[in-house]
A protein has these predicted regions:
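Acidic, Ala/Val/Gly-enriched low-complexity intrinsically disordered segments
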Residues: 5-8
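Cationic, low-complexity basic patches in intrinsically disordered or flexible, solvent-exposed regions
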Residues: 11-12
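The feature marks the mature, well-folded catalytic cores of soluble enzymes
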Residues: 18-283, 289-329
Length: 329
């Protein structure tokens, strides 16, 4: 009997089949505002020729910035680094009134690539100022978008960064206050902050707590929540200075997953995948799809098993923003 079983096994060797799954979040990657900003630089380069100056990174992604730099874009920190009269593009994050005034004083030919949803927050803040509200800005200190929004009103804006700030912030006129937010915040964190403010200041001008958080930020966070139920680990493609990418990584951790923020395939560590069957992969709003494929290829390269890639069910985004007039055909 033993010899017959042995012969059978030799004739039909036992094959143990392992499979690793990668589930791609949907939606992921570029949002309409990022697409518009990048296309603005590319169209300006094509229409006017290099160099084209850009104040700050056009979007928070080194891969995108380097690709545009190779085409002739020059990125600077402040407008006083730009030659008088040069073509200048403002980044998707928006700028303050002071930056606009300094640009005008230097005679710069400005093309504004500010995301329209950020511009909407600017208008909202100005409206509150005109109506004599004390303004709270919920956001991250030092973020370009926060600096731009706070610099759009002449009175001091009160920055609230977290729940502790919301509990301790002092308001001179609690009978007339309003709030605006950065567009790339955590939806859940923002709701908690607004709830605290509402309890402390019942007369605060209220709207939907997440009224200023952009559609793409909400959609990508919702996708990660759904994805977290299907995977053992989460990889988020995005830059360290990308607010929305960091929030996706944080959300993955809150959902109980080992979660890593990476720039691309070169950051993938094989040790992350020990005893892992299913990998969740998403990308922040400034990360191009080519980096998603780069990470997938890296996982396939280091995997000792077959890798099957699929997209999760999710919404299809159809939002589109027209380009600035100066770069339209």
């Amino acid at each position: 009997l033993y010899s017959s079983v042995k012969d059978a096994l030799q004739q039909f060797p036992l094959q143990i089949h392992f499979q690793m799954n990668i589930i791609l979040a949907k939606p992921r990657g570029f949002c309409a505002g990022v697409t518009r900003a990048i296309e603005t630089v590319e169209k300006a380069l094509a229409k006017f020729g290099p160099p084209i100056y850009v104040r700050h990174e056009i979007v928070h992604n080194k891969f995108v910035v380097e690709s545009l730099r190779k085409k002739g874009a020059i990125f600077v920190d402040e407008v006083d680094q730009i030659p008088v009269g040069a073509i200048t593009i403002f980044s998707a994050h928006g700028v303050s009134d002071r930056v606009e005034e300094d640009s005008l004083a230097r005679g710069l030919d400005v093309i504004d690539a500010t995301c329209p949803l950020v511009s909407k927050v600017h208008r909202e803040a100005k409206k509150y100022e005109e109506e004599n509200y004390e303004i709270i800005l919920i956001g991250h200190k030092g973020h370009p978008e926060v600096e731009g929004t706070s610099g759009r009103v002449k009175k001091d804006v009160i920055l609230v960064t977290d729940e502790n700030d919301a509990r301790t912030v002092e308001i001179k006129h609690p009978e007339k206050i309003a709030y605006v937010t950065q567009t790339t915040l955590s939806v859940d964190d923002t709701k908690k902050i607004v709830e605290i403010l509402e309890k402390r200041f019942p007369q605060i001008q209220l709207g939907l707590a997440t009224k200023d958080i952009c559609y793409a930020t909400q959609n990508r966070q919702d996708a990660v929540r759904s994805l977290s139920k299907m995977v053992d680990i989460l990889l988020v493609i995005g830059a360290k200075n990308s607010s929305n990418s960091n929030r996706l990584r944080d959300l993955g951790e809150e959902c109980g997953l080992p979660s890593y923020l990476i720039n691309g395939g070169s950051n993938v560590d094989p040790r992350w995948f020990e005893n892992i069957k299913t990998i969740g992969l998403t990308a922040g709003a400034s990360a191009p799809e080519v980096l998603v494929q780069d990470v997938v290829n890296k996982i396939k390269e280091i995997s000792k098993s077959e890798v099957v890639v699929s997209d999760m069910d999710g919404i299809t985004e159809n939002t589109f923003f027209a380009l600035p007039k100066k770069v339209r055909k």
